[in-house]
Amino acid sequence: MASNNVAQFAAELKMPAGVLLEQLQAAGVQKASEDDALSEADKARLLDHLRKSHGATDGDKRKITLTRKHTSEIKQSDATGKARTIQVEVRKKRTFVKRDDVSEGAEQGQAQVAEADDDAELKRREEEARREAELLEKQAQELRERQERLEREEAERRAREEAAEAERRRAEEEAAAKRAAAEAAAAQQAAAQQAAAEQETAPTQSAQDEARAAAERAAQREAAKKAEDAAREAADKARAEQEEISKRRAAAEAEARAIREMMNTPRKAVVKAAEPPKPAEPAKPAEAKGTLHKPAKPEGAQARPAVKKPAGAAAPATTQAPAGAGDRNKKPGAGKGGWQDDASKRRGIKTRGDSSGGVDRGWRGGPKGRGRHQDSASSFQAPTEPIVREVHVPETVSVADLAHKMSIKASEVIKVMMKMGQMVTINQVLDQETAMIIVEELGHRAVAAKLDDPEALLVEGETGTDAEQLPRPPVVTVMGHVDHGKTSLLDHIRRAKVAAGEAGGITQHIGAYHVDTPRGVITFLDTPGHEAFTAMRARGAKATDIVVLVVAADDGVMPQTKEAIAHAKAGGVPIVVAINKIDKPEANPDRVKQELVAEGVVPEEYGGDSPFVPVSAKTGAGIDDLLENVLLQAEVLELKAPVEAPAKGIVIEAKLDKGKGPVATILVQSGTLNRGDIVLAGTAYGRVRAMLDENGKPTKEAGPSIPVEIQGLSEVPGAGEEVIVLPDERKAREIALFRQGKFRDVKLAKQQAAKLESMLEQMGEGEVQNLPLIIKADVQGSQEALVQSLLKLSTDEVRVQIVHSAVGGISENDVNLATASKAVIIGFNTRADAQARKLAEANGIDIRYYNIIYDAVDEVKAAMSGMLAPEKREVITGMVEVRQVFKVPKVGTVAGCMVTDGIVKRSSSVRVLRNNVVIFTGELESLKRFKDDVKEVKQGFECGMSVKNFNDIIEGDQFEVFEVTEVARTL
């Protein structure tokens, strides 16, 4: 901001405006007020005045000193012969004096001062140059000695090689001559023998002799040809060796020539850099002026490139020298501390990028400089695109395997995981989702894959079955809210009394029945209506063809009714609405219809597609109409399934029977299940040893849409698992074991992925109470529903921890686990055996038995409420007014008080109020009436009180007396 007046200039200088006005007036600038304008001339006059007042003779600088520092390196051998790099620092200092028109005496004095400074500087520079020249001379002498030694060793080695080569050639020539002479003698001898033989046997064997003579002549020609080939091969070998020796000699000469060039160039460069500047130049006015205006270009600035240029020119000579035999046969210590190391050992300024021009790209591969490499090739590297791989990610994969699939190091994967907040090792197992995120983070394409999956054979087997499709009975699931009469409706249809036998009058198991009607067979699935059995209802909707939605006419649409509608719509299943309990006086079917329309279920009479049938499970009214509508919907759906084919189905319910072992209720969806078939259900497999219908009677086969109970599985299957018949038990075992391993790996991987988050949550939550439980139920569905219901009770302060949950009776193993984990055992429709009961009594383990899910949930909720920290509340018991204050030695301040309201107890806490503002909160130290200690003082009485650790009491203060009470909390 340009300052236009005195006030702005004072603000810019951060000084009072009055002081600035005084300084301006002292400088001869007449300014009367802060609003007066200031010009640049006024500011210049003020500056001159201030300089003179501070002792400066003139406003201009008379002298300027420039300091420059230059660092170079030289090689110096120590006593051990090892070359060391020595830093040589040259400091230069120049003083420039401004000359003007002053008296001659002043000029001479200034010239003498400048000359004295220049003489001292010149002497110091000459001394430094002399020392540097000595060091360089010593270095050059060492280089010459080393070069002479290298040349001498090279000449000796070359002479030895030439002598050995000549000796070897002479030996080879003698051997070749001997071989040729021997072969010629052998040929002559063979010819003589042949001639003698011919003369002896000519009269009798003329034909045989001619053939033998031809063979011998061919052998002689072959021998002569071999001798010629051997001689030619020996000559070629000798010529190649001679060429190799010539190449080595040329390489050695080139290296020696490069060394000689190097010896000559640095000397000149360093000596030139060390030349002191001429002392007469700074005295010239024109040059002094130029130096003052352009301080970045002193005279020595041109000397620096002269130092660097020869060194840079020597570097290409290094890289262009051919790497021949001279480099390979050179002794390891021969080049130690030589000129090749200058560029790589020289320290440079730290910059971004490569500023060395390729000199520092050498690498050292062994001790004492062996394996040294210079980048003799071009420094250009062609740009390459990153390779994007398609990585098939299985459901579980270790960090090492994932890195191998992407062709990178495992440490790169670990880095990415650490950035994501997870600490892993190379053997850590990752789930598929996490692994795919990592693959995409590293720039590759992730593909979910199931490699080496034996279940693929099941899909291939399914496509190969082309059995005839025949009509099958419909599977109808009865759904609705609890106590709306679903089971009673089924009892009337089946002529049974199942509802009377249910504990508490509510259904807690999913049941499967088939009913023969005059128009065909219908299979019913009865689902529980309690909110805890959501998973059961979802399984029922998954396996069904038609949903019968039971709604009580006196109760209307309830939460589980809405949930059943959502399950049916999600499965795309048609809905038949049965409005039950129409025999009650308070029944209102029209209200039920309106509520169902609001939920998206529109009756046929309103233009929808859902038939509404009013029924009464008690009187049987409307039952036939309901069955008629169900069968009508089934005809519209045209339900068909193959009969003469291996069976497929779904597990409706599963349990562990003490005498029968694992028992599963399955619904056959297609094919025919026979006794003795090999079945696979999730991770369980086995041969069907026994098969019972819903009435408990043995049966040999079950067709489509028929529910049966099977025995013979290896373990209790999960409810909702798909059941399939396989021809081979070995294949069933293989698939079951594969599923077990996959389930275990996926579970461990997900636990590991959530471990860090749970740790951080626990750290943030602090102390959390845990209620460990062990749950044993009669069937899988009930166990699943009970676990989910109890886990929903967890809060931020008390958490339900399910240590173990399974199907079957309570055993000794369960009691031992409860002892180790300090858990409570809950038995739902199960009991503990005698050994388990004795062990539980001995260890003090609490075992609770329930047959209604409400009771189990309510009691666990009450136990969790007891574990909650009690809530603390303050109750004000009285008010006290201070009338007089006494100072008692060794005791402190005692207040004489009047109890104006309530009662004051000795054990109470107190707040000190002054003008209705709390100034202290603490405890009563003493409570006296007259001179006696009392426990309490009632309203209207005087007393003496002292507060612990508080003595600042004055008359008129008020004491608010209160007590802290603990109140039990509930969930």
UniProtKB/Swiss-Prot annotation:
SUPFAM superfamilies: Initiation factor IF2/eIF5b, domain 3, P-loop containing nucleoside triphosphate hydrolases, Putative DNA-binding domain, Translation proteins. Residues 471-640 form the tr-type G domain. Residues 616-618 are annotated as: G5. GTP binds at residues 480-487, 526-530, 580-583. It holds the Pfam family IF-2. Residues 105-114, 182-200, 303-325 have a biased composition (Low complexity). The keyword Hydrolase does not apply. InterPro entries: DNA-bd_dom_put_sf, EF-G-like_DII, EFTu-like_2, IF2_assoc_dom_bac, IF2_II, IF2_N, P-loop_NTPase, Small_GTP-bd. GO terms for cellular component: cytosol. Residues 49-63, 121-181, 209-260 have a biased composition (Basic and acidic residues). Residues 49-85, 99-386 are annotated as: Disordered. Residues 355-368 have a biased composition (Gly residues). Residues 580-583 are annotated as: G4. Residues 480-487 are annotated as: G1. PROSITE patterns: G_TR_2 (PS51722), IF2 (PS01176). The keyword Repressor does not apply. Its main location: cytoplasm. Residues 526-529 are annotated as: G3. One of its GO terms (molecular function) is GTP binding. Keywords: Cytoplasm, GTP-binding, Initiation factor, Nucleotide-binding, Protein biosynthesis. Residues 505-509 are annotated as: G2. It comes from the Bacteria. PANTHER family: TR-TYPE G DOMAIN-CONTAINING PROTEIN, TRANSLATION INITIATION FACTOR IF-2-RELATED. One of the essential components for the initiation of protein synthesis. Protects formylmethionyl-tRNA from spontaneous hydrolysis and promotes its binding to the 30S ribosomal subunits. Also involved in the hydrolysis of GTP during the formation of the 70S ribosomal complex. Belongs to the TRAFAC class translation factor GTPase superfamily. Classic translation factor GTPase family. IF-2 subfamily. This is Translation initiation factor IF-2. It comes from Burkholderia cenocepacia (strain ATCC BAA-245 / DSM 16553 / LMG 16656 / NCTC 13227 / J2315 / CF5610). The lineage of its organism: Bacteria, Pseudomonadati, Pseudomonadota, Betaproteobacteria, Burkholderiales. The gene is infB.
